[in-house]
Amino acid sequence: MKTSEENNALESAASPEERINLSRFRWVLGAPYFVEGTMSLTEIPILYFIKFTLGMGGAGGQLFDSLRQIGWFIKPVWGYISDKVPIFGYHRKSWYVLMAFLACVFWVINALLSFIGLRVAEVYLLTFNLAFATYAFVDVVCDALMVTYGRREGKVGAFVNFQWTILAIANAGSVYLGGWFETRIQERIDHLWLVFLLTGGPPLLTAIVGILFIDETRVEIEKKKKKRASFEDFRGGVKKVFHWLRTAPASFREFRRNNRPMWFMMLFIFFWKFSPSIGFIERSYLIDVRGFTPDAFGIILSAGGVTFLVSVLVYSWVVKKIPSIGWHHYLYAMVALGVITFPLSFYLYLNPNHPWWKFIYFRIPEWLNPLPGWNRYEWFRLVVQVTLGFATIPAFMIPLTIAGETVNLAYAGMGYAFLMSLSNVTNLFEGVVGAGLYDLFSKPSMRGLLDTFQASFLNIAGTTDTRTLILEMFVYISLFFTLLTIPFIELLRRELDRRGIEVHLGGSKSA
């Protein structure tokens, strides 16, 4: 799903000397992201699995939902291994193929555990993370190839846009099917193990693509003659360790000076991404209180995926046609949009007779209503998901492009993986913090705080329900962290300007 201009831009990178077949390279870049998108097939079934099969409450379910992403955190380790440790004669190709096969294996294990009826949360936490860790390794290898070729040809932005276009297509279809499967699971027509088994199929595509399309020079590994260790060897090793410990602080300071943009990028990514998250808790509330069904979640999330796809294409077109708009301008606009639209976050917690509904509520004639069984809350979630999801795509794409432009090519795999892993760590951290805050606010000792909030003008819903009050408080917490990103955008902008680093959002040096 690329425009002819994007195709021409990618083709222009080919040269006889380099012998890079960009048609094959697109498969290498796109297949892992397509497969990552198909992983969304499990998103809704796992939500219901945590809530009803494992029987977890709000804070516990939120914590489990966050911790199942730990497998993505070791991306820097995978990046280092990919950069420095060849296997079967290759740095990238062999790891790419091996981990794709292991992803299949771990999803089969998840299917078997579900089939035998195991309900031990800790076991699933381990097996989910083993599966996600393999996706992370393939992702690292793919991104290392993308950064290496993209930086050389000035096409990082174009490659990033291409990858996430592919992911959006797969995600939209998979999450819809996930909702459909969960409905059938609740009707006892299908079973969760089937969803896990089907999720293990697409990684085979990645393995096949790696075997057929990754062109990599084979690494010749020198065979060193074995010799017996001696006391001199031991003493020399001890000296090296002490020397490393003595010089480590100076080496770290030198590394920090030479990679100053990356440190600013780390701060920016953390504060741009971080806001205490209650995703599972909110969805659980929507199931219990607002009557959301698996089909509704599937349609809403799928519509969000389609919106993501369309917005990626529009974003790619805009940044090519209007290159004069700087990356920081887009991000400041995203902050402003978040501030302006934050009152919309309250609507899911407002009763139908609340006066705020008068401003936006209207009835659709039955003959025009494609989803007659839906209530106002499901429709509201769908409309907001589509409209705001479309408008906020730069907030997602721009940090990826900046990371690709600033990482040191000497360790492209590890460096880019570290920045992306920081993004994943931030996602987990915000989920863990969200679970902790929700648990804290739920304690009897915090009743005074809740009573004060309930009696104040900040209680927009006018509710006395504890869960709703806490969810309202998180709306204000989210607004605070949105505003907190402003100084870090400016810090990063000044550092990139000082270093003379240009960020080409459209993937073209001439832009």
Locations of regions flagged by a protein language model:
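C-terminal transmembrane helical hairpin of 12-TM major facilitator-type secondary transporters
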Residues: 328-398
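Intracellular juxtamembrane helix-capping segments at the cytosolic ends
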Residues: 137-151, 393-408, 414
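Helix-to-loop junctions at the C-terminal end of transmembrane segments
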Residues: 73-90, 182, 310-329, 438-439
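A membrane-interface helix-boundary motif in multi-pass transporters
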Residues: 90-94, 180-201, 326-327, 438-482
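Transmembrane alpha-helices of Major Facilitator/SLC transporters
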Residues: 71-78, 297-321, 334-342, 427-430
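Helix-loop boundary and gating motifs at the non-cytosolic
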Residues: 10-72, 261-290, 431
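Intracellular loop-helix junctions on the cytosolic face of multi-pass helical membrane proteins
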Residues: 1-24, 114-126, 133, 137-142, ...
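Glycine-rich segments within core transmembrane alpha-helices of 12-TM secondary carriers
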Residues: 68-75, 157-179, 304, 420-431
